[in-house]
Amino acid sequence: MKSTLSYLLIICSLFTACIGHQEESLLFYVDTRTGTAPSATHTAELFGKNTEEYGQTLPAVLEPNGMNFWTPQTQDTEAKCKAPYYYKDTKIQGFRNSHWIVGGCTQDYGSMTLMPVSGTLKYLPQDRGSLFSHQEETATPAYYSVLLKDYSIFAEMTGRSRSAIFRFTYNQPEDAYLIVNPNSDEGKGYIEIDTIKKQIRGYNPVHRIYQGWGEPAGYNGYFIIEYQNEIEEYGTFRHDSLFAGQRQIADGTGIGAYLRFKIHETKCT
């Protein structure tokens, strides 16, 4: 059985139209993973073997001058000098709405991550991560795809200036889940499930670095996810505690929400 679930993720309540037919273009000659692996040049080695040897880029999809990056995530943190994705990592934890400054050593902020899983519900990033191969990964400025091997899920995404479209194809006859969490290292944030509007909404408060380190910056990263398929189960979680049937949760380490979808014998979108 193969089932396809599509999600529309909206930032700041701005909608986007469906993507159309993909045509051959020069975009597919651009590999956005460039800079995510450590440099082996003599000059790079002179500066050290930590973050200095990386380009601190990320394989993001977005429109030119877009407000948000959309990137696969292999690092579960918004910590300073830690990019969301590194080529050497072996597991993908989800797909992040990121504000990472490419080429810098600052921090990500106001971000959120969503991840499809199947079979047993695994919701924490360190538990739900799936093995993947770079040979089964496509990374261009307009389109990203990868096979999540642990779940036999083919994940695709494309970005607009303030929104993204995801398509997840579940290839196994197992329970199909979607996990969503705000990425707050400070244990702050909020998330709620609206089964009437078929939405997951939330925010991740931004915190300062350098002057006033750790203090609230006075604004949040807000997100809205719209889903199309009917759900059979929903709930929230906080770290290792699961709350089936609960619609909202706020503040705490490792908070998030999950949905379990109805899967039919025929393909659904």
Predicted regions and their residues:
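Accessory carbohydrate-recognition regions in carbohydrate-active enzymes
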Residues: 22-269
